[in-house]
UniProtKB/Swiss-Prot annotation:
Plays a critical role in the incorporation of lipoproteins in the outer membrane after they are released by the LolA protein. Belongs to the LolB family. Monomer. This is Outer-membrane lipoprotein LolB. One of its GO terms (biological process) is lipoprotein localization to outer membrane. Residues 1-25 form the signal peptide.
């Protein structure tokens, strides 16, 4: 059994134990202890954020859906996938120099989160670029190939590693004062990821609330 099948089988087993496969309600994760909710003019101003939403992964062999919780800052990322009943099926904690993945009672470590996920799952998921795309931003290696009627990026290709990732922004919303995607898809070969952001909250240091810029 290859890495991808082992990975999805482990997640499906955890979800099956909870008695439910698809997406459902969300529980609120506690905020980062040193950060507070802020309002920003655009997503690029938010050096930290947290989101609650849904993630669906599709391959020719498997379909996986889960609730997604992600807390991001320049110093660390904390990502959790859960079932509707709140059962945690995967956690990923990462800093610029380390990554820890916990799934199905097993722990995996590496110096890079993207490399760790690829080693364990077989998926080359662009964890390093996702914070930009989730907030509707364009990276230095991204090429915009379609725009909407307002001139905003609708589709882009990431040219970092061939074959390129194709990112499509399906819909947008206003959260924390900024315009961010509501739904987007990432496609590369026969792997497709679909994300839905039910809640996105910009975070900043407490001093920001007193008038400093984030």
């Amino acid at each position: 059994m290859n890495n991808l099948k082992r990975f999805t089988k482990s997640i499906f087993s955890c979800i099956a134990l909870s008695g439910l496969l698809f997406l459902g309600g969300c529980e609120t994760l506690p905020p980062m202890t040193d950060l507070s909710p802020i309002t920003v003019d655009n997503a690029a101003q938010a050096k930290a954020w947290e989101l609650q939403g849904k993630l669906a992964i599709r391959t020719p062999e498997d379909k996986l859906s889960a609730n997604l919780y992600w807390r991001h800052s320049e110093e660390r990322d904390e990502l959790t996938l859960t079932t509707m009943l709140g059962t945690t099926v995967l956690t990923l904690e990462a800093t610029p120099n380390s990554a820890h993945l916990h799934i199905d009672g097993k722990d995996f470590r590496d110096t890079n989160a993207q490399a760790l996920l690829e080693r364990v799952s077989g998926w080359s998921i662009p964890i390093n670029d996702l914070p930009l795309w989730i907030t509707g931003q364009i990276g230095s290696l991204d090429r915009v190939i379609a725009v909407d009627s307002a001139g905003q990026a609708k589709q882009l290709q990431n040219m970092q590693t061939p074959p390129p990732w194709l990112v499509t922004f399906l819909s947008w919303q206003s959260q924390s004062g900024a315009k961010v995607p509501y739904q987007l898809t990432l496609e590369r070969g026969d792997l497709q990821l679909k994300l839905q952001l039910n809640q996105w909250q910009a975070l900043g240091k407490p001093s920001i609330l007193l008038g400093e810029k984030p």
